[in-house]
Amino acid sequence: MGAETQPRVLISARDPSTAGAVKILVEEFLNNGQVELILATQFPATQSLSKIFKSIKHINVPDLPDDDELINYARKLLDEIQPDIVITGISGPGYGIDEVLLATCARDDASPYAVQSYWGDINEAFGAKAQVYLVIDDFAAKLTSQKTGKPTEVIGSMTYRDYNQFDTEQIRADFREEFIGNFDLLIGLIGQPIEASNSYDITLKAFADALGEQHLDIGIVYRPHPKETFEQRERTRDIFSKQGVTLYEGENFELETLLCGMDLVVSAFSTCGYDLQQLLLVSEKPLAVPVYLMFEEKLTRWFKEFTGLENIPMSDRGLAIVIESKSELAGIFDLESVRSKKLECWKSVREFFPESSKGAKVAVELILNNYKTKQKLC
């Protein structure tokens, strides 16, 4: 075990949404300098976090499709490291190193912790439960407590700590100078690795049909999710191709660059809409509007069952556009309406969103204080 004055901290990450928060958390622990840090990552988070590996001890967790192998790997990892504190991400869809660590690690009064990046998001694969969930706001805390019966700590959203350093207007200008061409409208299409019957494909087809009926020059920039399979990506491209809609590749752009450059950011219910809202919070001018395609009954039902939510958080009060009927699709391409919605969304975000820059500092102080005092939280 690590010495009390220098606790050994094991942090894990599997999903891209978790990776952003973990990166900031690792940097804050390094700045603090009071811990021995080990980071265990699994694809696709490994790809997202590669730049920080040289700063700390890193373990690349292999893709182990057999559950018993994954559990045995986690147990061996814990036996070798003997961490004082365990902090995991939360996977989904699917499960991985985060869940098996939560399910198999030894527990004390506070550890293990799970970092939540979406309201009420939990994953209890293998019976995984954190002792404490680190959540983004009071709404997330309420949902998580209801689902798990476990304590929560509101720390804000760590992922966005550095967003206030972005010159969003310059990023937008540079992107559009390179990409805009003669387009009247630029739309980012954010892919998701959803296999809920064929409801996701039906949703995309309806959107592609509506696009195909437009007489504007509209550029569609497609950014697949890292966990979308080759077959899923090709299916998406085929859906749009059949409607005569060209998808421009957006995978090689940084996510923030893509979001800043768009007029609309369209997905079924991707957290990229929340990323965009966080960029709007630090932008001096409107950028784009999140658009959620929530009109297909089976997909909407799947969302509610998977998340435990009735609606997409932060999508009311002008913070986003939620399409609840196919008949509403044509209206989102009206240029005057887009300009109006962009301004409304920007103003609403700045009025209603909490400030997120201190989340990692709050989390590290809380975790180390709990370790030092062995304060009983559960």
Where are these regions (language model features)?
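Active-site and donor-binding regions of nucleotide-sugar-utilizing enzymes
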Residues: L10-L30, Q34-D167, P193-E195, K227-E228, ...
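Structural motif
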Residues: R8, D84-I87, V132, L186, ...
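Short acidic-hydrophobic, aromatic-tinged amphipathic segments that line or gate anion-handling sites
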Residues: H58-D63, T246-E251, R317-L329
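A donor-sugar binding/catalytic signature common to diverse glycosyltransferases
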Residues: I97, Q131, S145, G250-W302
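C-terminal amphipathic helix plus adjacent low-complexity
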Residues: R317-C378
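Nucleotide-activated donor-binding/catalytic signature segment of Leloir-type glycosyltransferases, i.e.
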Residues: E234-E251
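Nucleotide-sugar donor-binding patch of glycosyltransferase catalytic domains
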Residues: Q278-R339
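Conserved catalytic-core segment of nucleotide-activated headgroup transferases in glycan assembly
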Residues: T18-E28, R161-D238
